[in-house]
Amino acid sequence: MAKTVGITRRSLLKGATGLVASTIGLPCVVPSSSLGKAGSVGPGSKIVMGSIGMGGQGTHNTKAFLGNPGVRVVAVCDVVEARRQKAKHLVDQHYGDQECAAYNDFRDLLARDDIDAVLIATQDHWHALIAVAAAQAGKDIYCEKPMGVAVLEGRAIRDTVRRYGRVLQTGTQQRSDQKFRFACELARNRYLGEIHRVKVGAPGPTYKRTYRKPVTEEPIPPGLDYDMYIGPAPMKPYNGGRLAWPDWYLIWDYCAGFIANWGVHHLDIANWGCPVLCKEPAEVECRGSYRNDGLTDNINDWQAELSYTGGLRMTFTDTGNPNKQGCRFEGEKGWVHVNRRGIWAEPASLLKIKIKPNETHLGDSNNHHANFINSVRTRHDPIAPVEAGHKASYLGLICEIACRLERKLRWDPAKGEFVDDPEANQLLARPMRSPWHL
């Protein structure tokens, strides 16, 4: 059970008192939260949003929401002044005014009662703290994957979202791609027969550091709130590589690596098509190597296998080691392989199947952002709900733990912990730098 997040900031500006000052001069947009009954949203009202984390992915997502006529973006937040001012300009230019607020501290944005929903696209080590605080503040959430950098962080997000009755869409947008859904529907409706193996491949060693300067302490550049950037992670001397992409993906303090970050995309599809992966106990084995260049230290390459009592196996490797990019379901009647480039099957006739009306259908979203906005209005779960994000995230994280400990582990999904293994269970959480805590 998640405790109240360590937010303070006068407890999100003490509600209304701080909100008066923060909302002066805002555009005349009635928040959807003030309309409708029992949490419902009128079809003509706009969903008022704020974006937290304005790097590449945050900008991409914000542009998608700007393109939705049922949304009004009123605030952006980033610890880098140049980024937040650029984001403010993007929003203001879109609406033709100067009304977008730009914040350094996400707590100031969350304290506004006119905001219905938030985008979270920060570095991974911030996801849990901000998502939990957002749910507690009554906001719906579009959260980039993964659900934190530790299993218990994802659990805290899940529990808090449900306790406060919020909508959360995980940024696993492959669920809004018809070919991924079709592959999963073939598996779920037993067109492949009994599934005996799932193969997942995700990027890993192909990503290299882009910040080429020496790994030495550098002056903190003007306009960067470095203390806020570090947040709950251990404080380390500033080096530009700590903010560069994909460099921060490769640093343990801010991310669990591609095994648990990018891997979430295809692990999510694996679990969507074969839900037993997160329902039954599994033995988890993983071997691999870690980066070690004085700055980056995350897992570089890996070969993991999860074994289930009924004979099902899932192998999860970095791309080409040996699994191909994507997700492959293998059954007694054939196989289907899907990734962002396409879908393949053996026999090929599987691809001509039409899922019958009385069979399992996995939704019809073709726009991940629009699906989220529709869920905010209807209060129904989106296509990638919080539970799905948590499960896909922890599959990668438990493989990383097995690799780090260099031994086989036994995972109990009902308890959400390893069996009779205190050392492994300690790694389900990460310590947070004071004053931050979950």
Which residue ranges define each predicted feature?
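A contiguous active-site-proximal alpha/beta segment in oxidoreductase catalytic domains
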Residues: 140, 148-225
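Active-site rim elements
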Residues: 170-172, 216, 253-260, 288-293, ...
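NAD(P)-dependent dehydrogenases' Rossmann-like dinucleotide-binding region
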Residues: 53, 190-209, 221, 225-236, ...
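C-terminal helix-rich "cap/oligomerization" subdomain common to oxidoreductases
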Residues: 14-43, 374-438
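C-terminal structured subdomain/cap of oxidoreductase catalytic cores
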Residues: 54-61, 336-411
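Rossmann-like dinucleotide-binding domain that binds NAD(P)(H)
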Residues: 227-309
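NAD(P)-dinucleotide binding in Rossmann-like oxidoreductases
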Residues: 294, 298, 302, 307-366
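N-terminal glycine-/serine-/threonine-rich beta1-alpha1-beta2 phosphate-ribose binding loop
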Residues: 2-143, 152-167
